[in-house]
């Protein structure tokens, strides 16, 4: 079964790579990105100049310029569907990242766990979680911690507060600032700098985790049971993923109400491609560059979420078998479909993981 899963994860990674890079390259998306970079202006903002210096390193600044152009339409809010897709992506990644970090801390010592966390985080920022997350699960598909040892080597040392605080400070807080509209609430100059600085969030995450481990948490490592700490981390990831998915789902329903009733109350939603990922193309009012970003984000998030769901479902089934519990596959499929619709794919993966952790749940799955 592990070998089959490994091939599934690798297939997902290759699919993501093809759709995010090869297909978009053939469709001219990266040429559009290069052309926009050559204009030295931000997308949709002909009067706002693109910053040319962020770190003082010319090669690195060139990469950051492309990244700022990439993230500007998503964070600025001109295109509602694109921004909502970015919101769903960002919130969903919190749940996925919590699952990955907890798994890393569970099977490694704190130092090695932080090194691996840093490598995985930088890799996913460089090429996208849609490629890196399936590859990570493919490489670690055999590394399952024993059910009897529920505490995490890394998380036990840093507590749930270390993981949650690190995620809030390194990822969520800069993301909120980055999403403020310019120039209404933040200057375009500052917004570009925040977008560039946010790209290093995996580094900030590891630094905050290490600081918490070394200086803050030494005096109260046993303040909560290990299992409760793990569940707190999962609940945090679930809440972030679910809330962002519900925001997107509400906008989707509103846009469909508008299209059916021809009401003018939701006119601002319908033209911007608020659609189920992968099924619909962005609407006609999206520019070519924004349409490419829409497609890139959809494949990046959906493949990462699908890989995490496959891994979580396999983990859940393995734990049920270990507890000698029978699984009603038809009922499980129906529950998964309902959770995916209401909670979102990332939150569904987190829900499966936390339910597989509790012996009390395994003894009474109803």
From Swiss-Prot:
GO terms for molecular function: isomerase activity. Disulfide bonds: none annotated. It comes from the Eukaryota. It is a multi-pass membrane protein. Keywords: Isomerase, Membrane, Transmembrane, Transmembrane helix. GO terms for cellular component: membrane. Its main location: membrane. Induction: The onset of expression occurs at 48-hour-old stationary cultures and the steady-state levels correlates with the onset of aflatrem biosynthesis at 108 hours. Its EC number is 5.4.99.-. The chain crosses the membrane at residues 9-29, 84-104, 113-133, 162-182, 195-215, 233-253, 291-311, 333-353. It is found in: Membrane. Aflatrem synthesis protein A; part of the ATM2 gene cluster that mediates the biosynthesis of aflatrem, a tremorgenic mycotoxin with acute neurotoxic effects. Synthesis of geranylgeranyl diphosphate (GGPP) by AtmG (a GGPP synthase) precedes condensation of GGPP with indole 3-glycerol phosphate, followed by epoxidation and cyclization by AtmM (a FAD-dependent monooxygenase) and AtmC (a prenyltransferase) to produce paspaline. AtmB is also essential for paspaline production, but its exact role has not been identified yet. Belongs to the membrane-bound ascI terpene cyclase family. This is Terpene cyclase atmA. It comes from Aspergillus flavus. The lineage of its organism: Eukaryota, Fungi, Dikarya, Ascomycota, Pezizomycotina.
């Amino acid at each position: 079964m592990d070998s089959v899963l490994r091939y599934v994860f690798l297939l997902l990674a290759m699919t993501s790579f093809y759709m995010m890079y090869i297909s978009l390259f053939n469709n001219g998306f990266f040429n559009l990105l290069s052309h926009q970079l050559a204009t030295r202006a931000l997308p949709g903002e002909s009067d706002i100049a693109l910053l040319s210096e962020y770190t003082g390193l010319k090669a690195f600044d060139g990469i950051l310029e492309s990244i700022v152009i990439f993230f500007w339409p998503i964070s600025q809010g001109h295109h509602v569907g694109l921004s909502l897709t970015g919101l769903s992506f960002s919130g969903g990644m919190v749940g996925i990242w919590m699952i990955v970090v907890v798994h890393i801390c569970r099977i490694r010592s704190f130092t090695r766990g932080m090194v691996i966390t840093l490598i995985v985080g930088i890799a996913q920022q460089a090429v996208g979680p849609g490629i890196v997350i399936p590859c990570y699960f493919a490489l670690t598909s055999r590394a399952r911690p024993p059910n009897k040892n529920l505490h995490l080597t890394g998380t036990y040392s840093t507590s749930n507060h270390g993981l949650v605080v690190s995620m809030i400070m390194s990822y969520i807080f800069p993301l909120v600032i980055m999403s403020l509209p310019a120039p209404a609430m933040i200057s375009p100059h500052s917004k570009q700098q925040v977008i560039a600085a946010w790209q290093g969030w995996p580094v900030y995450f590891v630094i905050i985790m290490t600081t918490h481990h070394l200086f803050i948490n030494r005096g109260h490592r046993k303040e909560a049971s290990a299992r409760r700490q793990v569940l707190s981390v999962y609940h945090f990831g679930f809440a972030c993923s679910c809330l962002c998915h519900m925001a997107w789902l509400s906008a989707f329903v509103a846009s469909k109400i508008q299209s059916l009733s021809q009401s003018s109350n939701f006119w601002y939603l319908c033209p911007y491609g608020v659609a189920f990922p992968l099924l619909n193309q962005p609407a006609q009012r999206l520019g070519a560059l924004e349409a490419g970003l829409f497609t890139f984000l959809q494949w990046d998030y959906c493949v990462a979420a699908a890989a995490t769901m496959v891994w979580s479902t396999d983990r859940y089934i393995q734990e049920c078998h270990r507890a000698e519990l029978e699984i009603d596959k038809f009922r499980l499929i129906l529950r998964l479909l309902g959770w995916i619709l209401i909670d979102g794919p990332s939150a569904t993966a987190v829900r499966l993981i936390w339910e597989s952790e509790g012996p009390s749940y395994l003894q009474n799955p109803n």
